[in-house]
A protein has these predicted regions:
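Charge-rich, well-structured scaffold segments of protease-associated domains
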Residues: 17, 75, 79-232
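His/Glu-rich zincin catalytic helix
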Residues: 1-80, 187-235
Length: 235
């Protein structure tokens, strides 16, 4: 990893790219009491159509990226949110049009928590039962969003600005679109976009950059993975 010093800001950041393609950024702050880690995939609500290395185009229902964000917390060992919380970390996630991010902060157990974060995001575990249950949960979230005037105005603006570009589609999807999502859909989209070459890890706080790199090397796959080709109409 190489260190870049930003003299005007009084800051320095370590950056490196692992052989598997993962970009890592670390801001060492030894005087801080907390550690913060952010792990993100360049995959979001507008990535509805893509082509994988077999050459075939896939059309996926609106809301898959957000649905995937919810379900990745489920692991064979239990719920990752509960595992991290039990180890003293505050954890959350979000899905935007072009990005899905998972993050935590805490004061203790950083190495273990970082390993957990990298593991549950990169190793999917879906069942038909859990997907069916999540459809009801997200449907309720969709209905709640319909009562949010700010959100309604935002998407009305996008629909007026774009006629075909998928950024006009709601990240969360609709009740009709999420009903089409299956465990196979989630596995396919995870395989297409959740590989190290399409992801970034950012860490800040009382941490050691070399230790962060070592954990990432140990937990994540060693290969970069094939990049899916996205279909984003020019508009």
């Amino acid at each position: 990893m190489e260190k870049t010093v930003y003299s005007a800001l009084g800051e320095s950041v370590w950056h490196g790219r692992l052989p598997n393609g993962l970009h890592i950024y670390v801001d060492e702050k030894p005087e801080y009491g907390k550690q913060f880690a952010f792990f993100a995939a360049c995959y979001g609500g507008m990535d509805l159509r893509f082509r994988t290395e077999d050459g075939h185009w896939r059309d996926t229902p609106a809301g898959v990226a957000h649905f995937l964000e919810h379900k990745l917390f489920d692991t064979e060992d239990g719920n990752a949110l509960q595992i991290l919380a039990a180890n003293g970390a505050e954890v959350n996630a979000f899905t935007a049009s072009s990005l899905t991010g998972y993050y935590f902060e805490g004061t203790d157990g950083f190495a273990e928590n970082l390993s957990t974060l990298l593991s549950f995001v990169s190793v999917p575990y879906f069942t038909k039962e859990s997907v069916d249950k999540e459809q009801g949960i997200i449907a309720q979230e969709i209905r709640m969003g319909e009562d949010n005037p700010d959100l309604a105005i935002y998407y009305m603006l996008l629909e007026a600005l774009y006629q075909t570009h998928p950024i006009r589609v709601k990240v969360i999807g609709s009740e009709q679109s999420i009903a089409q999502i299956t465990a196979d859909t989630l596995y396919e989209c995870h395989g297409a976009f959740y590989h190290p070459g399409n992801m970034v890890l950012c860490v800040a706080g009382n941490v050691d950059a070399k230790a962060v790199e070592r954990i990432a090397r140990n937990v994540l796959p060693g290969e970069e993975g094939a990049m899916a080709e996205r279909d984003r109409p020019a508009e």
